[in-house]
């Protein structure tokens, strides 16, 4: 791409409760400062001092070793048994260890993401379907990107914004605002221009779509106020927000996936757009469209099960009990 135009640089929309430090106690600020110090000198700076592949390998080995001893590992095992009831215990354990390894690689690569931009010579990020982004930009009409926690989800946002395409990227703000600002700065360094945390609500996303700006959302985690929609054969509470926004603005949903090809090497794919279901019953149309998104997510996971975020409690405990995986 020879077009060097970029959307508004460094725009960062933060939740009010995290940014209003006047309401924070001295103890909270001291705690945040200590955590940020540890972040800098135990994790970020040491990994940044290593080569990209060395950092990826180092943290992957650490998490593959300590991850199985955590409570999150037990949740992961239950989730895998829910999704793959025919797997042997060995298959479940091997996939769980692979998921820890993948998460470790993501963490190790984070300080180096500015070196991993797509659309440059010898890029570590292969992009399939990038022409869809060019079509969106030429149309001057927004889309709602939907994706999940596949492989290294950070590089999917980079593939959108570095094309470039004006897009608001949603994310979960870190509880520590000092660390959150460090992460935001790193994201800006590899091309993510407009960040919107989930705490900012849907109003900001509606404004973005209203002015023709695309939005991107992760739609694969539990949302207690959502819809019970099948996921790997079990009802999972799923956010209908992306679907509702797409329907309101008559925008297509464009699924994205990411697959790890090796240490710090990825393939990002922009898939065929999905139009929201046209059923005249709006609630039925929303359900059917959310089901399509869940089916897409499930299909991507099945291609590389160890590259998804199994640590998350995707199903409620009642579903675990019903499936006999407690």
Q: Which residues make up each language-model segment?
A:
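Non-catalytic C-terminal accessory region of glycerolipid acyltransferases
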Residues: 2-18, 23, 28, 86, ...
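Membrane-anchoring hydrophobic helices of lipid-metabolizing enzymes
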Residues: 2-147, 181
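Active-site metal-coordination segments of metallo-dependent hydrolases
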Residues: 74-75, 176-177, 236-239
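Short, composition-biased local secondary-structure segments
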Residues: 45-50, 152-157, 203-216
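Catalytic core of membrane glycerolipid acyltransferases/transacylases, capturing the structured
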Residues: 105, 137-199, 224-229, 260
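Short, flexible loop segments at the rims of nucleotide/cofactor-binding pockets, characterized by
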Residues: 120-125, 172, 191-197, 231-233, ...
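Hydrophobic alpha-helical segments typical of transmembrane helices
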Residues: 42, 54, 76, 156, ...
């Amino acid at each position: 791409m020879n077009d060097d135009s970029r959307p508004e640089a460094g725009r960062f929309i933060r939740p009010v409760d995290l940014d209003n430090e006047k309401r924070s106690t001295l103890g909270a600020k001291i705690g945040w400062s200590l955590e940020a110090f540890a972040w800098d000198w135990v994790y970020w700076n040491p990994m940044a001092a290593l080569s990209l592949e060395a950092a990826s390998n180092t943290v992957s080995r650490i998490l593959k070793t300590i991850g199985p001893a955590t409570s999150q590992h037990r949740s992961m095992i239950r989730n895998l048994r829910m999704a793959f009831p025919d797997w042997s215990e060995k298959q479940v354990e091997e996939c769980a260890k692979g998921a820890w390894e993948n998460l470790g690689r993501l963490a190790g690569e984070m300080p180096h993401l500015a070196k991993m931009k797509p659309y440059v010579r010898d890029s570590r990020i292969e992009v399939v379907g990038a022409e869809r982004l060019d079509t969106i930009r030429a149309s001057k009409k927004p889309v709602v990107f939907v994706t999940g926690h596949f492989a290294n989800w950070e590089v999917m946002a980079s593939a959108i914004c570095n094309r470039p395409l004006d897009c608001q990227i949603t994310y979960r703000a870190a509880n520590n605002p000092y660390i959150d600002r460090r992460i935001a700065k790193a994201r800006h360094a590899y091309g993510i221009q407009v960040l919107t945390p989930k705490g900012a609500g849907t109003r900001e996303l509606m404004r973005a779509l209203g002015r023709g700006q695309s939005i991107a959302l992760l739609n694969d985690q539990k949302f207690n106020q959502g819809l019970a929609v099948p996921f790997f054969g079990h009802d999972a509470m799923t956010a209908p927000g992306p679907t509702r926004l797409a329907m309101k603005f008559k925008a297509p949903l464009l699924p994205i996936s990411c697959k790890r090809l090796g240490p710090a090497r990825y393939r990002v794919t922009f898939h065929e757009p999905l139009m929201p279901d046209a059923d005249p019953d709006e609630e039925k149309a929303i359900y059917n469209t959310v089901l399509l998104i869940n089916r897409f997510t499930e299909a991507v996971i099945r291609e590389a099960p160890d590259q998804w975020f199994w640590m998350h409690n995707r199903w409620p405990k009642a579903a675990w009990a019903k499936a006999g995986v407690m």
